[in-house]
């Protein structure tokens, strides 16, 4: 069966081609480059003055989320051009002309390629040799070409240095994201990953009203997945669905967390913008590959979430 996961080059040119095909309302932009000089692409969809960020694959082991975000961007662009409603409810053109989407499907291109093809894909000989000396199997490697965990590299409260040579925002990929967050600010961040099937919202260096807004939007998104889950459970007989989880920005040293948040992009974005930042984990294990049919089904599960976020934000459901 045909596998869905695409190479970095194919993902990059898929975004570039979308911008060319739908040039009146889609823009392609390179926001920076990795340490091994792979460009980090971003696609802007819609004409809204403000933006909602959709971020994928800071962890190189996240091999599915880039494909989902690119596939989702293709569906949005086609629906926008044709004036279609998604799920017979979401008016794509109306929503994206209020808040446009900034889709960054592959924030760690070096780690993504390492996980697929091994350390030999790293062109810089010094980085390549350093990575091989770590004796970590390439399929278990989620860091960038310098061996740094990008999801722990943002300058948040409670940031902790975990190895020599690492400081807050020391990595090119993180610097690129920080620049675009600061330039656009935006109305929110949805960060997509694999692993657990859940939606995370954050507490910490924000006031109670902002925490309430984050929880309310996260709950709205969960309810959207619940409605789709009920239909799928009725069809398959299996229990499905996302659960909601609160995360503190600072996790005590004696407390374990499945997603340690100090240095993570979501609390950083929340701190600099005072806007909600949610992490959506799609419930697929690292190393799992999907067929095109499975990718399409997984995309249908989450494609309404950015739209529901914009709808909730612009319709007064969250104030």
For each predicted feature, which ranges?
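Soluble metallo-hydrolase cores and metallopeptidase-like ectodomains found primarily
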Residues: 3-52
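Short glycine/proline-enriched loop/turn "hinge" motifs that connect secondary-structure elements
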Residues: 44-46, 140-143, 268-274
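A generic structural signal for alpha->beta connector loops
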Residues: 23-25, 39, 98-100, 147, ...
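Conserved hydrophobic/aromatic pocket- or pore-lining residues that grip, position, or stack substrates
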Residues: 37, 57, 103
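General small-molecule cofactor/ligand-binding pocket signal
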Residues: 29, 102-104, 245
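C-terminal accessory segments enriched in acidic
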Residues: 1-9, 14, 18, 22, ...
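Short beta-strand element of the alpha/beta-hydrolase
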Residues: 51-59
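Active-site/substrate-binding loop(s) of hydrolase catalytic cores
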Residues: 49, 63-210, 279
